[in-house]
Curated annotation (Swiss-Prot):
Keywords: Ribonucleoprotein, Ribosomal protein, RNA-binding, rRNA-binding, tRNA-binding. This is one of the proteins that bind and probably mediate the attachment of the 5S RNA into the large ribosomal subunit, where it forms part of the central protuberance. In the 70S ribosome it contacts protein S13 of the 30S subunit (bridge B1b), connecting the 2 subunits; this bridge is implicated in subunit movement. Contacts the P site tRNA; the 5S rRNA and some of its associated proteins might help stabilize positioning of ribosome-bound tRNAs. Coiled coil: none annotated. This is Large ribosomal subunit protein uL5. It holds the Pfam family Ribosomal_L5_C. It comes from Pseudarthrobacter chlorophenolicus (strain ATCC 700700 / DSM 12829 / CIP 107037 / JCM 12360 / KCTC 9906 / NCIMB 13794 / A6). Part of the 50S ribosomal subunit; part of the 5S rRNA/L5/L18/L25 subcomplex. Contacts the 5S rRNA and the P site tRNA. Forms a bridge to the 30S subunit in the 70S ribosome. One of its GO terms (molecular function) is tRNA binding.
Amino acid sequence: MTETLETPATKIVPRLKTKYAESIKATLQDEFKYENVNQVPRLVKVVVNMGVGDAAKDSKLIDGAVRDLTQITGQKPQVTKARKSIAQFKLREGMPIGAHATLRGDRMWEFVDRLVSLALPRIRDFRGLSGKQFDGNGNYTFGLTEQVMFHEIDQDKIDRVRGMDITVVTTAKTDDEGRALLKALGFPFKTEA
């Protein structure tokens, strides 16, 4: 019989995660004078949310949002249901009104890398992200008006243009620390004039 040499499968570390560990972490530690390496801000999770308000009238619309989010994030999103009924919006409790996916670990790093290097530069007339959308604790939320900027989405197969909200949660204590981290990761912020 022949012996097969079993080599352990090498795990590919995301490019942005490697860059963070090798250069960004040390730069931030020097900039903010942290005494402990664990005080350096890092990414915790990225939440991608797609609200589909018209799904109250047509329940098939939620399927398109789920399909688009699955292609963009690489994982199946959670369907968001209405918490309470609102008669003016013809909304019943439990109706699907959106979808969201929470990315952590390597999927999060890959998504942020694709977002910064591929998706954001494809936006027409893009001038940069606003630096005023931090929440006071170093977390950043911004909205995108359409999903076609992601190269995973086939423009011929989309049923309608949908926007999305993306929240980047960090361990930063202040907005300045969060901004420095995201800028180092490649987020294109507008230069405030």
